[in-house]
Amino acid sequence: MEKRKVRMGIDVGGTYTKCVAMDNETHEIIGKDQVKTTHDDKAGVAAGVVQSFRNCLKNFNIDPSDVVFVAHSTTQATNAFIEGDVANVGIIGIAGGGLEGFLAKRQLRLKDIVLDEKVGRMIKVLNTFIKKKQLTDEVINQNIDELVSQGTDVIVASMAFGVDSMEEEQRIHDLASKKNIPVTMASDITKLYGLTRRTRTAAINASILPKMMATANATESSVRGAGVSVPLMIMRGDGGVMEINEMRKRPILTALSGPAASVMGSLMYLRASNAIYFEVGGTTTNIGVIKNGRPGVDYAKIGGHDTYINSLDVRILGCAGGSMVRISDKDVVDVGPRSAHIAGCEYACFTPEEEIVNPQIELVSPKKGDPADYCVIRLQNGKKICFTNTCAANVLGLVDEKYFAHGNANSARKAMQPVADKLGITVEELATKILDKDYDKVSSCIKSLAEKYELDHDAMKLVGCGGGAAALVPYCAKKMGLDYDIPQNAEVISSIGVALAMVRDVVERVIPNPSQEDIKELKQEAVDSAINSGADPDSIEVHVEIDAQTGKVTAIATGSTEVKATDLLKECDENEATKLVTKDFGKDVTDIKLSIKNDKFFVFEATKKGKNSVRIVDRKGFIKVQCSNAFVTKCKIENYKEVVEQLWEEQAEFRTDSVIRPDYFVCYGPRISDYSAIDLEQIYLLMDLDLGDRDKQEEIIIVASI
């Protein structure tokens, strides 16, 4: 019998560390385990990672040699910033002479980086500067020794225009490494201009290097000790994974990897290709975006400082499953941000009904400095409970029995009755007021994300994960007129995301009017980075984006740690694909038809609100593209330029002050690439990079979307 192959994903949350083991071929869950997150252990959260991993191996009889992939997300970097557990950073700045040197010296000189003003947490920064022509080994060593004598733990090498030539930074790196001092090169972290921001990003990275290297070593040796020999991968904040050796150089990339894990779970496991994604915990709700199979990404802010680190664009709201309710004599004032957990109270809907006798209102401030209008209910037996969002949703009958948030609606009613009486309304009206307060926060967040990422309301749906999902998602979806989905295994979706994550690397440069050669070089650089991060060369795909306004060109390489000879994920047939798109097209749709199919894709069209709506489904049942107004055609590669030009003119929308040109999706082989640019030549440039080397007689599918 052929040995099974197992993927293991471990997600480190604020309260629990959860491990999931999945079948590599079918993605079925073999087993799951959770332990309390080990914040206070001397090995930090790594202890919990290893514990849950070993439990999973033992409890589900997994042979360590069957494990082909093991990865974990980490809160270690984020916690280090929050708790101020950071090293002192010494910056060695380098620049030429004259005016350039004078300006660069000022830009390179960083002050201490404040992480939390209230409690005075900061990264201590020491500075030194070397003129480029004085850069000798002797001078570099003198500067390193001087910084170390002043208390430096870790070095940053940063040069003006260092992204164009890394030799000087590399020289400092090599000499510091010989002295066993951890070192970061600024142009290794990002290839973007902006000397101060690049140096600051490198300094923030350097500040957590010693701590993260110790954690990496502890985790790796424990995983090796369990008999697993495959590389240990770490989740990045942008939703990819990288090998632990890469993490030792660039630990800052792992900041915010918790929210990233849950978005990737939605993307890979739920096949969500266009969705607003919710992870509803007890205290906070993370909201992010998936558009055409890609999560929304932005630069991370750390301690309020802008960096050049890509992370998933996730908004964090202080209203969740366990949020407490604030009241006045006349109305519901607000819901959250404090949760029942903080006040040390049980949820009313999880309290036995018979205990709720003679409930009395008490108004408290859960933490010092909080307003004293948070509502707690004192029972006759002396116990204090809270009614929360989860209780309100149960009262309104919105939580199906199968969901984690399902509780006793009668218990919640009894606890809410005194407050309803005080406000002169029914319990149902009180529950509605509570959820309306959440809806105001959630809907404005969804609207701003939809605007930023140009999401089409008709194609949007809400995907709810986390234990508290059923408390908020059904209510908000109904009020916004959107479909929603709360999947099976929603409470371990983050661990699933880690287990299924791909290797990812991003290279960005500022290149005004890039040539085909420039983009080829950038693509190759992204491929090399992904290989260094652990991707198999044959599995790598590269997506290129050009920002015409800033001249920034971004190459995003994704790949897996192995190439699968056969993929046993169930093939999706025409019948199943039709069902998927019929559900996805939603209401008010007519004339659904399969307009093009080949051995890799199904392309469906339908009429909705007078427009031609399009969906592209791959053979695994992923809806890869959703367009609310588009035109579909097919042609041979030798003719693609004429077709693209024709659609460029025919599909253009002329408005009083501008012309809206189409974006293109092209299906070639097993891939779909999307192209958007403000001029046709740039579109050709990008398409030619993908199609230029393929057989001119190959048939491709082109979708032009407005």
Question: What spans do the regions from the language model cover?
Answer:
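N-terminally biased helix-coil "hinge/interface" segments that flank
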Residues: 2-706
